[in-house]
Amino acid sequence: MLRGSLTALVTPFEKSGRFDEKAFRAFVEWQLGEGTTGLVPVGTTGESPTLSHDEHRHVVKVCIEVANGRAPVVAGAGSNNTAEAVGLVQYAEKAGADAALVVTPYYNKPTQRGLYEHFAAVARATKLPIIIYNIPPRSVIDMMPETMGRLAHDFKNIVGVKDATGKVERVSEQRMTCGKDFIQLSGEDASALGFNAHGGVGCISVTSNVAPRLCAEFQEATLSGDSVKALELQDRLLPLHKAIFLEPGVSGAKYALSKLGKVENVLRSPLVTVEESTAAKIDAAMKHAGLIN
């Protein structure tokens, strides 16, 4: 069962721009020690668009090795090319991932029927559980609850969604079309409280890269019904949720992690490091959360 605080892992790079495997192994180990309940490598936060296919596969392999069964690994395996997505999912299955995260095809804007056919092809090609990643702001298309419901009913291995629509009511709508056992995970940290209140069971989080223990405690509080603690942690984390997204992409999270000494503040072009004004706001949010002095 995928539940709680799953981290959308950053991919550390050396100053030369190469994948920093040593830092990544240590980072995954730290995440597990801090209470993270699931690991999601090579998604958007892992800078998958700028990884080669060989690098993509290597990051997945390393993550699975380090996890060693201690937490589920949900391997990013999305593409706007159906055949390519199938290949990535099949590799994830061969490597020993526990599930695959498959994003809705971006840029080429398929219809709802096209979305159905894309995910149907992926589902037929693997036995891995598949989590649909619905993120309209980046993909420019939105999988409707009815389409998701058809997929969930037609394919037993389409088991859940990472929902980054920003519409918390979708949880209820998707429960009606997909069934009460369909796994619904928030794709937005700031609204995860409301998402879980509607029946969600966790979050694939960016902030948990930086504050894994707090995010894990927050998810546990929401899912156990401890509203007092959940609100306390929400207020503690909200400035950080907002600050690390003041600039697009993973730039904010990598800056914050560099402050903690976990990774180098290195991104691959076209992403760039945050502006000084943004860095100051992230610093303030980290202090508010109690992560730095």
Curated annotation (Swiss-Prot):
One of its GO terms (molecular function) is 4-hydroxy-tetrahydrodipicolinate synthase activity. Its EC number is 4.3.3.7. It is found in: Cytoplasm. It is an enzyme of class 4 (lyase). Pathway: Amino-acid biosynthesis; L-lysine biosynthesis via DAP pathway; (S)-tetrahydrodipicolinate from L-aspartate: step 3/4. Transmembrane segments: none annotated. GO terms for cellular component: cytosol. Pyruvate binds at residues 45, 204. The active site is at 133 (proton donor/acceptor), 162 (schiff-base intermediate with substrate). It catalyses: L-aspartate 4-semialdehyde + pyruvate = (2S,4S)-4-hydroxy-2,3,4,5-tetrahydrodipicolinate + H2O + H(+). Signal peptide: none annotated. The record marks 44, 107 as: Part of a proton relay during catalysis. Keywords: Amino-acid biosynthesis, Cytoplasm, Diaminopimelate biosynthesis, Lyase, Lysine biosynthesis, Schiff base. InterPro entries: Aldolase_TIM, DapA, DapA-like, Schiff_base-form_aldolases_AS, Schiff_base-form_aldolases_CS. One of its GO terms (biological process) is lysine biosynthetic process via diaminopimelate. Homotetramer; dimer of dimers. Catalyzes the condensation of (S)-aspartate-beta-semialdehyde [(S)-ASA] and pyruvate to 4-hydroxy-tetrahydrodipicolinate (HTPA). Belongs to the DapA family. NCBIfam families: dapA. This is 4-hydroxy-tetrahydrodipicolinate synthase. The lineage of its organism: Bacteria, Pseudomonadati, Pseudomonadota, Alphaproteobacteria, Hyphomicrobiales.
